[in-house]
């Protein structure tokens, strides 16, 4: 049986929390050989940006391990607080900007046991719109 109620006063199972905590934004799509990478911003993890990969076999998963300080990587750059691309990938080598400490890290997908290798030191420096130049060995 239905109930009549004034406009805007009926109960709803959808709350602002339902919408905001389940939101996932996708960005920064890149292709490296048979692999596709992208960043997911997850509201359920306080807006943390996570790097994901779909390999040639169709398997999807998070790519990066913990930082050397045992932090979850937040793939984000603070250039102008908007950034640009916060990671680059070439031939399975990933360079990523971690918002937690502002540093760049290198990660080799084929040699996972090496973990994240810091490329920069701590400091008030911003990195953004990353690209890898393998010919000159530059990021």
PLM-predicted stretches and their roles:
Residues 1-139:
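Beta-propeller folds
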